[in-house]
Amino acid sequence: MDDQLKHMTGQVAKGTMTRREFVGRAAALGVTAAVANSMLANHAQAAAHEAPIRGGTLKIGSSGGESTNTLDPALTASEVPLNNLRHLYESLVEVDPNGEIENRMAESYEASADAKTWAFKIRKGIQFHNGKEMTPEDVLKTMQRHSDENSQSGALGIMRGIENMKVDGDNFIVELGVGNADLPYLLADYHLMIQPDGGMDNPGAGIGTGPYTLEVDEPGVRHGFKRNENYWDADNRGHTDYNEVLVLNDATARTAALQSGQVNMINRVDPKVAALLDRAPNLTVKSVAGRGHYVFIAHVDTAPFDNNDLRLALKYAINREEMVDKILRGYGTIGNDMPINASYPLFDESIPQREHSIEKAKEHYAASGHDGSPIILRVADGAFPGAVDAASLFQESAKAAGIPLEIKREPNDGYWSEVWNKQPFCASYWGGRPVQDQMYSTAYLSTADWNDTRWKRPEFDEMLLSARAELDEAKRKETYSKMGQMIRDEGWLILPMFNDFVDGVANNVGGWVEDPNAELSNNKAGIKCWVKDA
């Protein structure tokens, strides 16, 4: 039995068996769920504590890169820029794979009893890449820049909840109008990377405190990073001499690059080839469930999308189970037109699942009074793997309901700068956030810069603020439930599926840690992993 369990834990690590399957099969062998989960945790911990090897070059093949990309953390919106941020910069705190807060530029933090005032003690002796020592003033200026209404920062919605910020000795102080026990999670947002003088003068310079310094910056092509020899946490990050991120937006090209040894790891393995790729010699497919979701979004302030009956018609028309089966190939779960799933704390499982119903789609489409002109949906596989095929499935099911959905395929390059958040109806992707407050504050608060559906409801904003201040978890959960149902029934988010994060990794890579926060081990694989044959 021991050999069988050992083999099964290895399958979970490779992503060929889910945790649920492991627990079920272990139960058949007489192992309790508690013991089974402990075995998985011990296996992951042992892998994570493998002795690092210093030196060598690590190459990452990643989708989500464009010629318009910048190194300004405020403007980061896709995977390649996010990977770059992890190499160059660090935030006050981070969220670890277990969902706990990990201190980075902050050495410690504490809050007042009402969670309105927070003090983050800033580490001493940490240098930026330009030799300047990081100070609490750099932290303050960074946060002030992201609070500027003209910053276009993806964290602007988060920062609007802050009334005042200041420096007090070694501490960065945050004062809130409404208490928020989740504030550290909000400040872990990847846009809030600490820069010298807050990045006020040159936010795209690439100068941070991270484990690597910038060597090559060719947006849309490649980015190169050299190990920072003065890095403060060298025992845990920055093991390789050099890292390179290659922009490979085409899924077939990414897979070929991994198979040929051109790169050591890739993100967003096409689910159609995942099982086949995992059988290839010297390669492993890593899969972890999380909060990422593939979506179709429209602007509620633009006709004909300002009609809720039309919105509901399309929501009932889409066949979620078909998409999970055919697009995700089982690497995910069905969605419910709200960005929250069971991976989130305080999720309400009693919210009814919206079912595929052609009859209801027809009823709502007729009630919408739409004139029958083509409804244009813009897509590219750069939005998410299989987006074009998913749109085709959507088009067919909409056709069955008499809805004239027309697909317009856009180029991958420029999709995130020219289509997303600009065109009124398109495919999109969200990686999710650690807590509900952050997800809602980033994309659904009326004043959020990344409110990509333009859905604005004062009553929703009020509920978000009241949930922040609510210390009774049952009441907080009830408020979050109402908010989720508002988006589900009134918003312009069509969320057919939550995706697993599916990555491909060469077996000569060590230090991989399963992280449900985002793909490529929360985009930290490049800074935490090493090359075994360096």
Language-model-detected regions and their locations in the chain:
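Ligand-site clamp/hinge motif
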Residues: N230-L276, Q395-E396, P404
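Surface-exposed binding/hinge segments that line
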Residues: K121, G154-D197
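N-terminal secretory signal peptides
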Residues: M1-E21
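Gly/Pro-rich hinge or "lid" segments in bacterial periplasmic/extracellular proteins
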Residues: D96-E100, L187-E244, D250-T252, I358-E359, ...
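Extracytoplasmic/peripheral linker and loop segments enriched in polar/acidic and small residues
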Residues: A400, P404-Y415, S441-N507, D533-A534
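N-terminal lobe/hinge region of extracytoplasmic solute-binding protein
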Residues: G61-A113, Q144, I207-T209
